[in-house]
UniProtKB/Swiss-Prot annotation:
UniProt superkingdom: Bacteria
One GO term of the biological process aspect: dTMP biosynthetic process
Keyword Methyltransferase: yes
Subcellular location as annotated: Cytoplasm
Active site as annotated: C161
Signal peptide residues on this chain, from the entry's feature table: none
Sequence similarity: Belongs to the thymidylate synthase family. Bacterial-type ThyA subfamily.
Protein's recorded name: Thymidylate synthase
Entry EC no(s): 2.1.1.45
Pathway connected to this protein: Pyrimidine metabolism; dTTP biosynthesis
Length: 286
């Protein structure tokens, strides 16, 4: 059993046994009913990527390719355009969060409001981060924040769930490692937990490659970790499943010091991944 599988089962059990019920919940199911959930607060996990510990479960298949494409949409394309996400990456699940009548920051008609990539572009976040790490890798101010009150007031739109990432550099002997800490305000445990974690591991790997560093540790903090009330059967099924014997790893197949903006989604490869099947179905809360 991988570390991710152990943490996954522990979190599911804790939510089901100790979680409290949401109140005045915002999300809705497609039929318009309120999407209530059981949740815990203050969830934390640590993975040492350099030792092959990756935050992806083997208890069900995870759509890692489309998840990584979303990282490129946000941090390379730096746009909120649904047209770019669909036409360039063939990713469609963000359509449910379209904000009607709000054009994208690149002029396209369809957008998710002034969120995610639009905020990255507005503040030139990636270029500033890379320049800061270039000037002094050991500085303690390497922060990506997507929490922009001005943007929230400007347009409607889903406020970012994974909203802050911090980076630190460590030298161990002759090797330099890049660590990352992801802070998330809210996480759908069964659907999005490993997707979000692996997305930001991919971002960490892209930045490390840019400088020729090794990937180090990945820390994951979630303020509100929940399971929706239409997912309890799937939760019980996941607890019954026996994980596969594989130890999946994400690999970035580009040379060291490849420019961040030259890396492509197809450069990533998930190896030794043989998840338990069949896939489970989930009705999303929007």
């Amino acid at each position: 059993m991988t570390k991710a599988d152990t943490i996954f089962k522990e979190n599911i059990t804790k939510i089901m046994e100790e979680g409290v019920w949401s109140e005045q919940a915002r999300p809705k199911y497609k039929d318009g009913t309120t999407a209530n959930s059981k949740y815990i607060t203050g969830s934390f996990a640590e993975y040492d990527l350099s030792k092959g510990e990756f935050p992806i479960t083997t208890l069900r298949p995870i759509a890692i390719k489309s998840a990584i494409k979303e990282v490129f949409w946000i941090y390379q394309d730096q746009t909120n355009s649904l047209d770019v996400l669909e036409d360039k990456y063939n990713v469609h699940y963000w359509n449910d969060w379209e904000v009607e009548g709000v054009p994208a920051n690149n002029g396209d008609k369809r957008s998710i409001g002034q969120r995610y990539g639009a905020v990255v572009k507005k503040h030139d976040i990636i270029n500033r981060l890379l320049a800061q790490l270039e000037a002094n890798p050991w500085n303690r101010r390497n922060v990506i924040s997507l929490w922009d009150y001005e943007a929230f007031e400007e347009t409607a739109g889903l406020q970012p769930c994974a909203f802050q990432t911090m980076f630190d550099v460590r030298r161990v002997g002759e090797d330099v490692y890049l660590d990352a800490t992801l802070t998330q305000r809210s996480n759908d445990m069964l659907v999005a937990h490993h997707i979000n974690a692996m997305q930001y591991v991919a971002l960490q790997m892209m930045i490390a490659k840019h400088f020729g560093w090794k990937i180090g540790k990945f820390f994951y903090f979630i303020n509100n970790l929940h399971i929706y009330d239409n997912q309890f059967e799937q939760a019980e099924e996941l607890l019954k499943r026996q994980p596969s014997d594989c130890q999946p790893r994400l690999v970035l197949n580009v040379p060291d010091e490849t420019n961040f903006f030259d890396i492509k989604p197809e450069d990533f490869e998930l190896v030794d991944y043989d998840p338990v099947k069949p896939q489970l179905k989930f009705d999303l809360a929007i």
